[in-house]
UniProtKB/Swiss-Prot annotation:
InterPro entries: Huwentoxin-1 (IPR011696), Huwentoxin_CS1 (IPR013140)
Taxonomic source organism: Cyriopagopus schmidti (Chinese bird spider)
Similarity comment: family membership: Belongs to the neurotoxin 10 (Hwtx-1) family. 51 (Hntx-8) subfamily. Hntx-8 sub-subfamily.
The name this protein goes by in its record: Mu-theraphotoxin-Hs1a
Signal sequence residues: 1-24
Amino acid sequence: MVNMKASMFLTFAGLVLLFVVCYASESEEKEFPKEMLSSIFAVDNDFKQEERDCAGYMRECKEKLCCSGYVCSSRWKWCVLPAPWRR
Protein backbone atom coordinates (compact mmCIF):
# COMPACT_ATOMS: atom_id res chain seq x y z
CA MET A 1 0.00 0.00 0.00
CA VAL A 2 2.86 2.36 0.82
CA ASN A 3 4.55 1.60 -2.48
CA MET A 4 1.41 2.59 -4.41
CA LYS A 5 1.10 5.85 -2.47
CA ALA A 6 4.73 6.69 -3.20
CA SER A 7 4.35 5.99 -6.90
CA MET A 8 1.20 8.13 -7.07
CA PHE A 9 2.97 10.94 -5.24
CA LEU A 10 5.96 10.76 -7.61
CA THR A 11 3.65 10.74 -10.63
CA PHE A 12 1.77 13.77 -9.34
CA ALA A 13 5.02 15.59 -8.50
CA GLY A 14 6.34 14.81 -11.99
CA LEU A 15 3.22 16.24 -13.61
CA VAL A 16 3.45 19.39 -11.48
CA LEU A 17 7.11 19.78 -12.39
CA LEU A 18 6.30 19.32 -16.08
CA PHE A 19 3.58 21.97 -15.83
CA VAL A 20 5.95 24.44 -14.14
CA VAL A 21 8.68 23.88 -16.75
CA CYS A 22 6.23 24.28 -19.63
CA TYR A 23 4.73 27.42 -18.13
CA ALA A 24 8.17 28.95 -17.56
CA SER A 25 9.34 28.22 -21.09
CA GLU A 26 6.07 29.55 -22.51
CA SER A 27 6.29 32.79 -20.58
CA GLU A 28 9.89 33.29 -21.76
CA GLU A 29 9.19 32.61 -25.42
CA LYS A 30 5.73 33.98 -26.17
CA GLU A 31 6.83 35.15 -29.61
CA PHE A 32 8.30 31.79 -30.62
CA PRO A 33 5.11 30.32 -32.16
CA LYS A 34 4.50 33.48 -34.18
CA GLU A 35 8.09 33.51 -35.44
CA MET A 36 7.93 29.84 -36.33
CA LEU A 37 4.65 30.18 -38.22
CA SER A 38 5.85 33.24 -40.10
CA SER A 39 9.02 31.43 -41.16
CA ILE A 40 7.06 28.37 -42.28
CA PHE A 41 4.53 30.35 -44.28
CA ALA A 42 6.91 33.01 -45.54
CA VAL A 43 6.43 33.52 -49.25
CA ASP A 44 9.45 34.15 -51.37
CA ASN A 45 9.12 36.70 -54.16
CA ASP A 46 9.77 33.98 -56.74
CA PHE A 47 6.74 32.00 -55.57
CA LYS A 48 4.22 34.83 -55.45
CA GLN A 49 1.40 34.59 -57.94
CA GLU A 50 1.55 36.96 -60.81
CA GLU A 51 -1.24 39.47 -61.17
CA ARG A 52 -3.83 38.43 -63.75
CA ASP A 53 -6.66 40.20 -65.50
CA CYS A 54 -9.04 37.48 -64.35
CA ALA A 55 -9.67 35.83 -61.00
CA GLY A 56 -8.90 32.12 -60.56
CA TYR A 57 -10.58 29.44 -58.46
CA MET A 58 -11.80 30.63 -55.02
CA ARG A 59 -10.61 34.19 -55.70
CA GLU A 60 -12.73 37.26 -55.13
CA CYS A 61 -14.74 38.27 -58.17
CA LYS A 62 -16.25 41.58 -57.03
CA GLU A 63 -14.03 43.75 -59.21
CA LYS A 64 -12.40 41.18 -61.50
CA LEU A 65 -14.06 38.80 -63.90
CA CYS A 66 -13.50 35.09 -63.37
CA CYS A 67 -11.10 33.25 -65.67
CA SER A 68 -12.52 30.93 -68.32
CA GLY A 69 -14.07 27.81 -66.85
CA TYR A 70 -15.24 29.55 -63.67
CA VAL A 71 -18.34 31.53 -62.73
CA CYS A 72 -18.82 34.15 -60.02
CA SER A 73 -20.85 32.80 -57.11
CA SER A 74 -23.69 35.20 -56.40
CA ARG A 75 -23.74 34.25 -52.73
CA TRP A 76 -20.03 34.24 -51.81
CA LYS A 77 -18.60 36.46 -54.60
CA TRP A 78 -15.88 33.89 -55.35
CA CYS A 79 -14.96 32.27 -58.64
CA VAL A 80 -16.20 28.68 -58.56
CA LEU A 81 -16.64 25.81 -60.99
CA PRO A 82 -19.89 25.97 -62.94
CA ALA A 83 -22.51 23.44 -61.90
CA PRO A 84 -26.10 22.78 -62.98
CA TRP A 85 -27.50 24.45 -59.85
CA ARG A 86 -25.42 27.62 -60.46
CA ARG A 87 -27.09 28.78 -63.67
